[in-house]
């Protein structure tokens, strides 16, 4: 990071913020450091070209944008990165470059920041011209000459005459652009131009190998060509000899800068007699006078030239194969180094990794062993079922989760419907809160066995035990069962199945609900006079009302009030949204005072308002009993 400029860091940070990893890597590969692009950045960009979800035009545009920089270092490194991707990247990259009309418009580039900028600007212009020519060549022949198959069955050796005469000049133009780089060993003074020279050196070897195979194919077909084709072929061969001389000079520069001698191919010159034979054959086709030459001599000369060029091609192929082998060995060495580094890291911290890996398992195992899971929907065990048999007289087919449901819903509703007369005499601080059922003082059975024999299902709501339900205390002197008079005595509460603790149950669809127990405002109390007065008032004695005085104030749809259709009315949650109450089936006595309506709601037209306890200011609406002929709770007695 020390060689990077502040501009490079800001640009990389901007791409990091925008989330463009490709643009950030392009910026990192083309910094102002006077050195070649780093291998890690080039490898990342190569991998990006192989990914189908990477936008190749965006990658190329990022590189083109970097070439507009005024610094020769940034521009040169941008060209090197582009060249590297064209050679080693996916073919989609060079296909996109070939589809563009123009690539690099750097023919007038000049960096005037220093003397080195002037010198490097010259090579930048030459280098950009070669890259443009490389893309144009791909556009014309639809393949890269540096990547074509070589050998006896290669692309250039099996090409027909017409196509061969059109393809070889394209290779010549690309070779001319490469050799025009024309750098000396004294000018390779920095890492940037050295990186560009290495890429050009590898391209020169591969390109000349394809060029050499094209010439071999041309010579083999030369004596069978027409006159015009022979003329074109002779011109191509003369240019080939010139470029062979230039490529030899280029390879000498590579040897001078320190490239291994084994990586430089040996170029074998064709015999000069071959050129004379080609010229004589063309002259004979044109009708000129030539010295006599036999077909055998021409065949010998041609075979010698082809063998010389074939040896050159073999040398070029060996160099290419050696380069591939070196690349494979380098990758294997890197992989081996990574494995050794990984083994060292594991050897340093063996206990820590094992401990951290085993800790969660051991902790969870210990938790499982110490805290067994409770299945709230499982059936009771055999021991619990045996101990529950004496108390399970009426609930033989009762589901195990019924007590839990009643513990949440039914018990608090019954216990808090009327409240206690003594406790409710004092107004609550918050009239909108339901009075807690815990304030009701009830005698609780001392039978502890009922709790010890409870199944785990009963304990599914730990800490939320059901509120006790008030039982009416029968009078010592009077034991009157008024419910049995009308034949609707409930049998569901005849047996105490809870051992002293009431155990509410959920009624099914085909089972009638039991008569609701009266809250602490009891019909029958310890005082005989008050009990008789309440009973007489409920029966309507002395007010002249008979059973035939039943009136229906609304001609609408009748709704049954008893049986499975009965639903308790819950107090409204707010003072302005009162619950709609259905009109009673039987009219109340005219002398019965209505009291105050709960929460100050006016009575409905054509119906009797809900009766509430007169002494309460904020009380809840009364639950309508299922028996229309039963006692009406909350009515007061007036003696006529």
Curated annotation (Swiss-Prot):
A Gene Ontology term for the protein's cellular component: neurofibrillary tangle
GO biological process per UniProt: amyloid-beta clearance by transcytosis; axonogenesis; clathrin coat assembly; clathrin-dependent endocytosis; dendrite morphogenesis; endocytosis; endosomal transport; hemopoiesis
InterPro entries: ANTH_dom, ANTH_dom_sf, AP180-like, ENTH, ENTH_VHS
Region (Disordered): 543-568
Record's subcellular location: Cell membrane; Membrane, Clathrin-coated pit; Golgi apparatus; Cytoplasmic vesicle, Clathrin-coated vesicle
Record's keyword terms, sorted: Acetylation, Cell membrane, Coated pit, Cytoplasmic vesicle, Endocytosis, Golgi apparatus, Isopeptide bond, Membrane, Nucleus, Phosphoprotein, Ubl conjugation
Domain ENTH: 14-145
Gene3D superfamilies in UniProt: 1.25.40.90, ANTH domain
Interaction with PIMREG, as annotated region: 221-294
GO molecular function, one term: SNARE binding
UniProt note on tissues of expression: Isoform 2 was found in most tissues examined. Isoform 1 has an overlapping expression pattern but is absent from lung, heart and pancreas. Both isoforms are widely expressed in the brain, higher levels are seen in hippocampus, dentate gyrus, medial habenula nucleus and cerebellar granule cells.
Pfam families with a match to the protein in the record: ANTH
Listed Polar residues bias regions: 544-554
Source domain of life: Eukaryota
Modified residues (Phosphoserine): 16, 20, 303, 315
SUBUNIT field: Binds to clathrin; involves primarily the C-terminal sequences, but the full-length protein is required for full binding capacity. Binds phosphatidylinositol 4,5- bisphosphate. Interacts with PIMREG; this interaction may change the subcellular location into the nucleus. Interacts with AP2A1 (via its alpha-appendage domain). Interacts (via N-terminus) with VAMP2; VAMP3; VAMP7 and VAMP8 (Via N-terminus). Interacts with LC3/MAP1LC3A.
Function description: Cytoplasmic adapter protein that plays a critical role in clathrin-mediated endocytosis which is important in processes such as internalization of cell receptors, synaptic transmission or removal of apoptotic cells. Recruits AP-2 and attaches clathrin triskelions to the cytoplasmic side of plasma membrane leading to clathrin-coated vesicles (CCVs) assembly. Furthermore, regulates clathrin-coated vesicle size and maturation by directly sensing and driving membrane curvature.
PANTHER family noted in UniProt: CLATHRIN ASSEMBLY PROTEIN (PTHR22951), PHOSPHATIDYLINOSITOL-BINDING CLATHRIN ASSEMBLY PROTEIN (PTHR22951:SF16)
Protein name, UniProt field: Phosphatidylinositol-binding clathrin assembly protein
Gene giving rise to this polypeptide: Picalm
């Amino acid at each position: 990071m020390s060689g990077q400029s502040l501009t490079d860091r800001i640009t990389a940070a901007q791409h990091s913020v925008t989330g463009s990893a490709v643009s950030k890597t392009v910026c990192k590969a083309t910094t102002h450091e006077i050195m070649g692009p780093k291998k890690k950045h080039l490898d990342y960009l190569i991998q990006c070209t192989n990914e189908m979800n990477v936008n190749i035009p965006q990658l190329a545009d990022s590189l083109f944008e970097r070439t507009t920089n005024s610094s020769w270092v940034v521009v040169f490194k941008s060209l090197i990165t582009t060249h590297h991707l064209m050679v080693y990247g996916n073919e989609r990259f060079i296909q996109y470059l070939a589809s563009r009309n123009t690539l690099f418009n750097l023919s007038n580039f000049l960096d005037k920041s220093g003397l080195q900028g002037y010198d490097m600007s010259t090579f930048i212009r030459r280098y950009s011209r070669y890259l443009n020519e490389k893309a144009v060549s791909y556009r014309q022949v639809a393949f890269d000459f540096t990547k074509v198959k070589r050998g006896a069955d290669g692309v250039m050796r099996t090409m027909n005459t017409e196509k061969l005469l059109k393809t070889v000049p394209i290779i010549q133009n690309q070779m001319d652009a490469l050799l025009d780089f024309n750098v000396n060993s004294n000018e390779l003074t920095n890492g940037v131009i050295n990186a560009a020279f290495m890429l050009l050196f590898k391209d020169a070897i591969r390109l000349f190998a394809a060029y050499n195979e094209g010439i071999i194919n041309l010579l083999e077909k030369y004596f069978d060509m027409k006159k015009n084709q022979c003329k074109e072929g002779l011109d191509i061969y003369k240019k080939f000899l010139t470029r062979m001389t230039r490529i030899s000079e280029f390879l000498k520069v590579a040897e001078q800068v320190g490239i291994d001698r084994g990586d430089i191919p040996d170029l074998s010159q064709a015999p000069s007699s071959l050129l004379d034979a080609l010229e004589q054959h063309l002259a004979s086709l044109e009708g000129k006078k030539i010295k006599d030459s036999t077909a055998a001599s021409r065949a010998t000369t041609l075979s010698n030239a082809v063998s010389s060029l074939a040896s050159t091609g073999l040398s070029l192929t060996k160099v290419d194969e050696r380069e591939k082998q070196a690349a494979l060995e380098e990758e294997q060495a890197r992989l081996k180094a990574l494995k050794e580094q990984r083994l060292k890291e594991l050897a340093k911290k063996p206990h820590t990794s094992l401990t951290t890996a085993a800790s969660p398992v051991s902790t969870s195992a210990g938790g499982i062993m110490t805290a067994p899971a409770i299945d709230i929907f499982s059936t009771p065990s055999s021991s619990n079922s045996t101990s529950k048999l004496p108390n399970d007289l009426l609930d033989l087919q009762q589901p195990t989760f019924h007590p839990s449901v009643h513990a949440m819903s039914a018990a608090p509703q019954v216990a808090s419907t009327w409240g206690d007369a003594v406790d409710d005499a004092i107004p609550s601080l918050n009239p909108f809160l339901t009075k807690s059922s815990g304030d009701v003082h009830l005698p609780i059975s001392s039978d502890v066995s009922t709790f010890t024999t409870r199944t785990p299902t009963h304990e599914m709501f730990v800490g939320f035990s059901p509120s006790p339900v008030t039982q009416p205390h029968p009078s010592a002197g009077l034991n009157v069962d008024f419910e049995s008079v009308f034949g609707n005595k409930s049998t569901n509460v005849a047996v105490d199945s809870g051992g002293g603790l009431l155990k509410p149950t959920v009624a099914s669809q085909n089972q009638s609900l039991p008569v609701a127990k009266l809250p602490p405002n009891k019909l029958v109390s310890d005082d005989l006079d008050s009990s008789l007065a309440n009973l007489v008032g409920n029966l309507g004695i002395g007010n002249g009302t008979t059973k035939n005085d039943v009136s229906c104030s609304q001609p609408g749809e009748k709704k049954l009030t008893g049986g499975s259709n009965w639903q308790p009315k819950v107090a409204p949650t707010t003072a302005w949204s009162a619950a709609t109450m259905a009109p009673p089936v039987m009219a109340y006595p005219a002398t019965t005072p209505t009291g105050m309506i709960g929460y100050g709601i006016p009575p409905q037209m054509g119906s009797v308002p809900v009766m509430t306890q007169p002494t309460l200011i904020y009380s809840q609406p009364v639950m309508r009993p299922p028996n229309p002929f039963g006692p009406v709770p909350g009515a007061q007695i007036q003696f006529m």
